[in-house]
């Protein structure tokens, strides 16, 4: 299998543009999304997330295997520092993202998340 990573002198290491994509969550913050790319951008739904609450949603992704590592972060939009974001329940064909509101109030923001699948082996 050819590598999905590319390295160019003077540039950051990452995946090629053909291995990235984006998706916008519909309906609510718990709605599953599908994005079959090694790296991607998920724009969450702008529904309210109460203070100290968390929500999880499934990312269906044919590139993901149970032994992969998934990294996710709050990339933009919304109140910086008000969310904790993690990937979990990594399986063949999917993973979950959990977003926690660590602010003191309810937030209704369509935050943007970046994820990257690090292939095992």
Listing of model-derived features with the role each one plays in the protein:
Residues 1-66, 89-121:
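Extracellular receptor-binding modules and their adjoining Ser/Thr/Gly/Asp/Asn-rich linkers
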């Amino acid at each position: 299998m050819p590598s999905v990573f590319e390295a160019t002198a003077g540039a950051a290491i990452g995946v090629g543009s053909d291995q990235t994509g984006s998706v916008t969550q519909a309906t609510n913050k718990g709605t599953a999304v599908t994005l079959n790319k090694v790296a991607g951008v998920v724009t969450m739904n702008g529904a309210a997330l109460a203070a100290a609450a968390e929500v999880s949603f499934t990312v269906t992704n044919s590139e993901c295997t149970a032994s992969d590592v998934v990294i996710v972060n709050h990339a933009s939009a919304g109140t910086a520092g008000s969310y904790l974001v993690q990937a979990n329940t990594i399986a063949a064909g999917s993973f979950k993202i959990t977003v926690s509101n660590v602010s003191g109030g309810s937030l209704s923001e369509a935050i943007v998340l970046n994820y990257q699948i690090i292939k095992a082996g």
